[in-house]
Regions:
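N-terminal accessory targeting/assembly segments
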Residues: 1-95
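Hydrophobic anchor at the beta1->P-loop junction of P-loop NTPases
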Residues: 150
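P-loop NTP-binding catalytic core
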Residues: 67-69, 73, 79-145
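Short N-terminal secondary-structure initiator segments
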Residues: 59-60, 144-146
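Conserved glycine(s) of the Walker
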Residues: 157-158
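The conserved Walker
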Residues: 154
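Hydrophobic positions on the alpha1 helix immediately C-terminal to the Walker A/P-loop
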Residues: 161, 165
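Post-Walker A helix-loop "phosphate-sensing" segment adjacent to the P-loop in P-loop NTPases
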Residues: 167-169
Length: 169
């Protein structure tokens, strides 16, 4: 199970307190069910849960300073070092959590070479599902390894099943 601190350490203090309160209070949805934190300039933050329920944090509007703070924390104050990841739209942080970023694309010769004016951040919470590959591992590994392509829409568990396959190997 991933630690909540791996995510909350990336957030501005005012947002961090609310996220911790929402997901750690007994009887609430809980961190184990938190799937995403959606953060967009001039909008309230949204907590998404695995059961497709959402909690809109109405009392906080995200500012450009909040976005800048999160980017600094995600890139450890070295945005240049993460430029390739940012260009691809996300950065993976400790615990396997993915931080999706969206802003204005910077292009050179018709190719995206970076982003500026980042206005949206989506934090995808990594979840370990031990045993989810149990039904397919024999097929993949019997008689030697087979080439396998895992395809599904976003958020349906591709990375989760790949991690479990690796755990078996």
């Amino acid at each position: 199970m991933s630690d909540l601190k791996e995510i909350t350490c990336l957030l501005p203090e005012r947002l961090k307190r609310i996220v911790e309160t929402e997901v750690m209070v007994p009887g609430k949805n809980g961190f184990c069910k938190l799937s995403e934190i959606r953060i967009r300039i001039n909008r309230p933050a949204i907590l998404m849960y695995n059961n497709n329920k959402e909690k809109v944090i109405e009392n906080i509007k995200i500012t450009s300073d909040d976005i800048a703070y999160i980017i600094q924390m995600v890139t450890r104050y070295s945005m240049y070092a993460y430029q390739d990841s940012i260009r691809q739209g996300y950065v993976t942080v400790k615990g396997g959590h993915r931080i999706g970023v969206a802003g204005q694309a910077i292009t050179r010769d018709g190719h995206i070479c970076g982003q500026k004016y980042i206005s949206y951040i989506n934090i995808r919470v990594a979840h370990e599902v031990v045993g989810c590959a149990d039904e397919i591992i024999d097929f993949i590994c019997s008689g030697g390894f087979k080439n396998t392509l895992v395809v599904s829409p976003p958020g349906c568990g591709k990375t989760t099943i790949l991690r479990d396959i690796i755990r078996h190997i």
